[in-house]
Amino acid sequence: MSLPKDLLYTEEHEWVKADDGSYIIGITDFAQDQLGDIVFVELPEVGDTVTKGDSIGSIESVKTVSDFYAPVTGKVVAVNETLEDEPELINSNPYDTGWILKLTEVEEADVTALLSSDDYEKGLD
C-alpha cells in the first residue's frame, strides 16, 4: 500500500496536501483498494463551502457506493473534472491524477487535527 509521508490523513481515509495556500483532497490508496474498481464520482460544485465531517459527494465502485467526507472546512475552488470521464484514476493514482478537489479558506485548526502518515498507518492495523 502506498502512503506518501508528505500528506496528512483522516481516520475516514481521506488525504490532504498543502498546495501554496490551498489544500488538495483525495482518498487514500487503502480506501480505493477497499472500494474496488471505481466507476463514478459525484463531486461538489466549485464555490461551495464545505464543513469538516459533512458528506460532500460520493464514490461509486462495482462493489458499493461510499460517501466522501470533507476532512477540513473550506471553500471549493477546483474539482478534478477528469474524474467525470475517468473515475478509475482514483484507483490507478489516488495521490496524484486521482485527486478529488481543492479547497481554500481552510481553518488551520482543522489541518493541525489531521493525522501524520505514521499515525494513519497505525490506525490501519
Swiss-Prot record:
<dbReference type="InterPro" id="IPR033753">
    <property type="entry name" value="GCV_H/Fam206"/>
</dbReference>
<dbReference type="InterPro" id="IPR017453">
    <property type="entry name" value="GCV_H_sub"/>
</dbReference>
<dbReference type="InterPro" id="IPR003016">
    <property type="entry name" value="2-oxoA_DH_lipoyl-BS"/>
</dbReference>
<dbReference type="InterPro" id="IPR002930">
    <property type="entry name" value="GCV_H"/>
</dbReference>
<dbReference type="InterPro" id="IPR000089">
    <property type="entry name" value="Biotin_lipoyl"/>
</dbReference>
<comment type="subunit">
    <text>The glycine cleavage system is composed of four proteins: P, T, L and H.</text>
</comment>
<keyword id="KW-0450">Lipoyl</keyword>
<dbReference type="InterPro" id="IPR011053">
    <property type="entry name" value="Single_hybrid_motif"/>
</dbReference>
<dbReference type="GO" id="GO:0019464">
    <property type="term" value="P:glycine decarboxylation via glycine cleavage system"/>
</dbReference>
<comment type="function">
    <text>The glycine cleavage system catalyzes the degradation of glycine. The H protein shuttles the methylamine group of glycine from the P protein to the T protein.</text>
</comment>
<protein>
    <recommendedName>
        <fullName>Glycine cleavage system H protein</fullName>
    </recommendedName>
</protein>
<feature type="modified residue" description="N6-lipoyllysine">
    <location>
        <position position="63"/>
    </location>
</feature>
<feature type="domain" description="Lipoyl-binding">
    <location>
        <begin position="22"/>
        <end position="104"/>
    </location>
</feature>
<dbReference type="GO" id="GO:0005829">
    <property type="term" value="C:cytosol"/>
</dbReference>
<comment type="function">
    <text>Is also involved in protein lipoylation via its role as an octanoyl/lipoyl carrier protein intermediate.</text>
</comment>
<dbReference type="Pfam" id="PF01597">
    <property type="entry name" value="GCV_H"/>
</dbReference>
<dbReference type="GO" id="GO:0005960">
    <property type="term" value="C:glycine cleavage complex"/>
</dbReference>
<comment type="similarity">
    <text>Belongs to the GcvH family.</text>
</comment>
